[in-house]
Amino acid sequence: MGVSKIESTQASTYIDDIHDKVTRASNVIVPLSPISVFAARSPWARLEHKSFDEIAHWLKETRKVDMYPARMTILEANQKGEIDDAYVEQFFQQWLNDTALKIPRENAAQYGRNALKLETLETPTDIKSQLEALVSDLNEQVKFESENTVPLKSTYILDEKNERLIDTVDYHTIKWCKLYIDDAQSGWTMPNRDKGLFYAWRRLVAYDPALTKDQRARLKSLPNEAEDLMQQALSYLNISEADAQTYLENHLLSLPGWAGMMLWQDEHNHKVHDLLFSYLAIRIAMEWAIVEPYLPVSQPEDLNDMNKEELIASWIQWGNFSMQSWKALSIEAQQAHIQFAYRFNEQFCRKLWLDAWEATYNQQLKAMIGPKSSVEAEQQSQTLVQMAFCIDVRSEPFRKHIEANGPFETIGIAGFFGLPIEKAELGKKYSHPSLPVMNQPQHKIKEYTHEHEPNAFQQRKHALESVTYTFKKMKQNVLPSLLLPELSGPWLSLQMFTRSFIPKSVGSVIRKFYTSWLKKPNDTALTLNYEPQHQHNHRHIHLEDDLPVGFTDEEKVNYALQALKLMDLTDDFAPLVVMCGHGSQSANNPYAASLDCGACGGAASGFNAKVLAQLCNLPEVRQGLLQEGVAIPETTIFAAAEHQTSIDTLTWIYVPKLTEAARNAYENIEAAMPKISYQANKKRLSQLPNNNLTNRNPNHEVYRLTNDWSEIRPEWGLAKNAAFIIGQRELTKQSDLAGRAFLHNYNWKNDENGTILENIIAGPALVAQWINLQYYASTVAPHYYGSGSKTTQSVTAGIGVMQGNASDLLTGLPWQSVMSADNKMYHSPIRLVVVIQAPQAFISRLLENDETFKQKVMHGWVRLASVDEDNHWHEWSNEVKKFS
């Protein structure tokens, strides 16, 4: 693409409130956490003040990123019966009725119906010359308005090799980010790293051999302070104050992964300050230094120009116009028809198809859920075990198998169990926030042993860490690295052979090693009681913050009461109540954290389950609960377990002394668990692409998959998630939800003021929405919001993955998490529908009180339906507008 010269513009331009503009610009990205604590986030979480469709249009215009499902994805879903054609016609007619048309309705209807077939537009070669002449005449007589954008200078300036200079800017940006962010992976760290990114870059860039002498000189001429440097570079690039924020946004959107990591560091690492500002200052300075020889330039006039030839051709193909009938239209009519086609483009067609897809799923879900049989009440009174599972969609089919195999009741609640804690596990160097990422921990709970001297577990743990540390240091140093292959070669070769050909056996050996040689002491305990800071020294836990350790007596009762109310368990207690966290097992999987509990910030949630179970067993807590109207029988015992989602087993992590009734219940669930696991694994294996695995023993096969380091898909994770159902279990117990629904228990009759519902919406429902939109984004725009194929990923700097050595830090899910084969989707990219079992008055009150949730529904980021007290289904997408 050529560029045209304009007059020199290196006059000084000062942009007011540049820090505020950077802060506002950062809303176009989201923080990207290190992959070891991968937590699902909606890539559009900070843009929900605008509608889904507005952001889709904006991204298409500015980044060429499509937020709607692809044409082939829609056609495949339609063929599979996931989209009802009647809804497509319904939404099209509704749009025609609501739109002020400037062309005859019959023309619009005919064009629209043909365009909605999503057929490829083909322009006959014999009319191309006539189209060119028509467009030439139109351009002389009519001025068509196009989008007003502020693209980066480097996106439309080409170098001598006819390559865009933005690629060079990205290359240098990535290089400096990798050097700075490096998480103790390299033996020789970036000089001056401890003084901040900008300071280190400023000292080193003058010696960068990848830059030309002139480029280094230009950078050296810029000011030494980040703000002054950014101001000067923007001035040299001729960016006005009015365009500054948009220009900053485009820089952030060029590499949203690396920018997101800088933003995450700003928000979570107290050792850094203004890291995102430094990132932008460096990037803009690099851009100016690279494009300066080509300045001054003007933006090409055709950058955002509509393709009028194609639009006229679309009327000939889909509007059944001939060239003669088109020419017979007046200039004004031609302009109106072109504008209609420009608006009713393929992206808009796919938007209507998405609406129809979601409406079809709503209708299917409506038909599945409803009142249950009268036998339910009798079964409830005979329940032996009540098991509270995370709302995770993988829990739903597992819960169904449990309920079918005995007098067992299951309950849904977010996996952090309402506990705002940071956990410090025995043997771990660092603590981890074990709650949704949008919340901050209020307490630290530590796991410790009663022994005051270092015990065998600690010694063995340190010994293993020493071996790993020594191996790493030998790799990083020049002389020892020459000797390392001779020493480690035979052992690593043996490991490679065994893990490749007998993964299940090797995995079994490794598990036995960790469960025996590295088994935690039996006397481990949790710091549930509040402790002053000076008592922490003997715990052998590194503290990174000043959070209070443990709970006060009042807090213990409050958190236990809150959790029991959230799961609607305040009476009719079974002899055994089990809090079930969940985690996942897989080998050689950088995305292992994405398979753990999203409500615990990308970590297994068994720790939270154990904390709550122990709280509920404390006599003083039960006494406090009794004063609040919750009477737990003396025969009821709380225990904790962890659901391993990749092998569908239940691992007990806390079983106190049991009463006779609780012991009987425990033995019943233990006896049923092998059959439950077998059934659950068989069902889950049948859904994997290589479904001939079900011909083998399911339990053996899942262990092989989780231990095979070449396995790209040990489980489907949360793929196909589509609904968040808030209501009693009776609403869904007899329904086959196909592992697509988050299930949270709720009884509106016990929530007179609506506080419980508001808490569910503000916490668990938000987590579910973020998970849903991350899967959605990774499916519809895998090149931008996904992370490519697992087989070609490389873990970078210990904090994320890249494709190759010069890509963005990838933000989303790998291809194997959402697709079952090339060009064949597995995840259905539809937006989450929240279904609430409550009277309409409850929903109205929720929308009036919760402005954030109302905005999500109104702007199309989440859908809302309800089931009232008479089991009638209500859609709220249009009703919500009444509350604005």
UniProtKB/Swiss-Prot annotation:
Q: Which Pfam families match?
A: DabA
What positions belong to coiled-coil segments?
Answer: none
> Where does the protein end up?
Cell membrane
Gene Ontology molecular-function annotations: zinc ion binding
Asked whether the UniProt record includes Nucleus among its keywords, one would answer no
Ordered alphabetically, the record's keywords are:
Cell membrane, Membrane, Metal-binding, Transport, Zinc
A GO CC term assigned to this protein in UniProt: plasma membrane
Q: Which domain of life is it from?
A: Bacteria
- Cite the binding residues for Zn(2+): 390, 392, 582, 597
Indicate whether Cell cycle appears among the record's keywords.
Answer: no
What is the membrane topology listed in the Swiss-Prot or TrEMBL record? Answer: Peripheral membrane protein
According to its UniProt record, which cofactors does this protein need? Zn(2+)
Subunit details: Forms a complex with DabB.
Membership in a protein family: Belongs to the inorganic carbon transporter (TC 9.A.2) DabA family.
Q: Which PANTHER family match?
A: INORGANIC CARBON TRANSPORTER SUBUNIT DABA-RELATED (PTHR38344:SF1), UPF0753 PROTEIN AQ_863 (PTHR38344)
What is the protein's name according to its record? Probable inorganic carbon transporter subunit DabA
- Originating organism: Staphylococcus saprophyticus subsp. saprophyticus (strain ATCC 15305 / DSM 20229 / NCIMB 8711 / NCTC 7292 / S-41)
Q: Which gene encodes it?
A: dabA
